[in-house]
Amino acid sequence: MGRLAELLRAEVTVPLGFAVTVAAYRRHCAESGLDERIDEVISGLPADAGMDSVEQASATIREAFEQREISTELAAEITESYEQLCVRCVDVNVPTAVRSSATGEDSAQASFAGIFDTYLGVSGSQRVLDAVRSCWGSLFTARALAYRLRNGISHHDMPIAVGVIELVHARASGVAFSVHPVTGKRDRVVIEGSWGWGEAVVQGLVTPDHAEVGKADNRLLRYDVARKTVVSAFDYAAGRVVEIDMPGRLVDRQVLDEEQVAAVTSAVTAIEEHYGYPVDVEWVVSRHRRAGDPVCIVQARPVTVTVPEEPAAAGWDPVAMAGKYAFGTSGKG
């Protein structure tokens, strides 16, 4: 969430939203007795604990988070922020993405990207409160817990904030890299995209279209149209984003035209220039976007995988790409 605020100040187009701060997380853990319960569970785990023990500890702690209600005062503050967001978005119950953001998650060295949860399509104040609480609990996923145990990191030194951001109505979305994620080439921007929301892309559930653009002259070097069989769409009845079969008319249709490719490229190169290092970015082309408008950026992180510039095997490997980029996602009804 801090990166989105920074990008907004740098005049990058980002969705509206608000943050539930680290202070709010600490306050909830102290007031609800979670601090004591967490310490009790973790104190019984050695640094080399097996995954069965780690998963059991994770389940116990996450269940404790679900059982502890947010205090009336804190819940009122979060509810007020959500209601203000609804006013700004001109929507009675604006659908949101509720995203975890822990200390160190965006560090290129720590490579924490993807270790915590995101809940998509969350609308209504009570559902937002439930999703915030679940995001807090995701600090203790088995993967996150095992990582901290191996590296001697205390959960007290790695508190979690939560971003509640407007869920942009996506025509198309995906990921983009300011360095080739497979070959390591720094002379191009690599774009992967599909129809709808980007979860099917980052989870490796769909083979996305693939584009490469030269940084020197913004020339489109290649565009491969993939056969896309799954789409992430908003289920209004369930109140969440779900994966469904791609409509037949879109399976083999090119996702981005040249103008849209150029808009994504422009955003990615601007973000790389702002930070001064290679980045990977989540982008969304809104249904309401007009030609010439910027695309919306919903996440930007340092590239966490360093690879040599050498020829790579041909073909798209969704599992490999998801491993490089994916972040945990769950629908929250």
Language model region names:
Residues 199-203, 306-312:
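Cytochrome P450 core scaffold surrounding the K-helix E-X-X-R motif
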Residues 1-161, 172, 252-267, 272-276, ...:
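N-terminal beta-alpha lobe that positions the nucleotide/phosphoryl donor
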Residues 99, 110, 119-121, 130-132, ...:
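Beta-strand scaffold of nucleotide-dependent catalytic cores
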Residues 188, 192-280, 285-286, 319-333:
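Conserved catalytic alpha/beta cores of large enzymes that bind or transform nucleotide phosphates
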Residues 161-172, 178-180, 240-248, 252:
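Amphipathic, soluble alpha/beta structural segments
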